[in-house]
Amino acid sequence: CLKAPKLLREGGVGEDIIHSVVSHGYGITIGCGVTLDVAPEHEMEKVLFAADELTGLIWAAALMRPSKSVMDMEVSSIKKKFKDKRFAAGCSRDTIRTGAENLGWELNELFDKTLRAMQSCEAEIQEEMKQEERS
């Protein structure tokens, strides 16, 4: 991620997109001990920051369901998994909370909007998972 801005510039990507890519890791300390310090400023950047960790938690919860799907999931299921710090322990609850705060949203609103977005692209997610299994 420290190399991302350089690589993106070399690829002709605009500074606004580069800022968005880099800011989604704001405050996270990476393997080399560097803490990323580009704060999300625009709403899209804040949504990306908030949803990145949360989608991991939601997907982990979906994989534990008999359906292996988010289609039959409710916000109450996400809340329950969010409270269990052992579940999807690699998904930072603090980052999710900070993301909701940055957006001015309650956690329930972030959970609901993220779940609905994931439900809207369930077919594509499932197809990507199948392709990954084949490779």
Regions found by a protein language model. Give the residues of each.
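Alpha-helical scaffold segments in soluble metabolic enzymes
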Residues: 7, 59-62, 77, 95, ...
